[in-house]
């Protein structure tokens, strides 16, 4: 049974699962689907097009599936998909998709800290930690288990690899490959995210191989030559393949 405050508004066409808690001054719009066991504290707004899983907690001021901040948007029907077990803190805003991709996606088991923004058509993986006041422009992609510290600004269309860590206050105009620390101004490669990799259970052998991959990529002539040297020299584990595929498919170029 859902617990809905008499001071909340739930549109009659909204679809709610079971055991949800909806606090005072929450607003649930039409064309909304919500799973089970979600907690919406006071003053949470769930806009049209929201597709929310289960076991999420939304803190005061969170606004989900807002109208995209895109002048090309013409009111097309799009969605914002949120997975399970997310903690979405105070004043987080997540825009729904546009005609470009049709939906914004937030995976599962993420912590989105207060006052951060997820732009239209972004695709966020799972296991992410994104710090206070970090802003993601439209169509940003972040792979699983990345960490973005506070006040990070990410340019539209950027791709951030899994297990990467971006230092606080950084500006990211280019793609950030997996497993690394990115920092300084302008943004640069600052070594591997060794502490994060160890915490996630990576072995010394895996970490050493990732290190050697970047050593060859960044120190062997051109990037193309570095990729060729990696393929000739190192075993093609899933970590190495992930790095090479990320670099080869980068649309904005990678930080160096």
Model-flagged regions — what are they?
Residues 3-183, 187-188:
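Structural signal for interior beta-strand "rungs" in well-ordered beta-sheet cores
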